[in-house]
Amino acid sequence: MGRGVSAGGGQSSLGYLFGSGEAPKLAAVNKTPAETESSAHAPPTQAAAANAVDSIKQVPAGLNSNSANNYMRAEGQNTGNFITDRPSTKVHSAPGGGSSLDYLFGGGSN
């Protein structure tokens, strides 16, 4: 197959970007009268179960729905509420003091 030769694959879905000149074709669904009758009398049990799941999916990943600490922080990309609930590795001491590595370097003893 040469360069610029189509291998088939059907119509491009990028027509909305490049202006295909054609409106997208809608698929027509034909129902028989028996299908429409049975669907009109079907109990709405699946719809009720789907609504309960949808309310859970409304909370973004990594955020606990019961946490009140869901605000954006301007400290960097690795701050905020994590999915893993691991403790932070951020250094919490001022430069030059309060190091937890004194046991390695012999500091802290006068």
UniProtKB/Swiss-Prot annotation:
InterPro entries: SPR1/2/3/4/5. It comes from the Eukaryota. One of its GO terms (cellular component) is cytosol. The modification Phosphoserine is found at S67. Residues 28-110 are annotated as: Disordered. Residues 95-110 have a biased composition (Gly residues). The keyword Transferase does not apply. One of its GO terms (biological process) is cortical microtubule organization. Residues 63-82 have a biased composition (Polar residues). Belongs to the SPIRAL1 family. Acts redundantly with SPR1 in maintaining the cortical microtubules organization essential for anisotropic cell growth. This is Protein SPIRAL1-like 2. It comes from Arabidopsis thaliana. The lineage of its organism: Eukaryota, Viridiplantae, Streptophyta, Embryophyta, Tracheophyta.
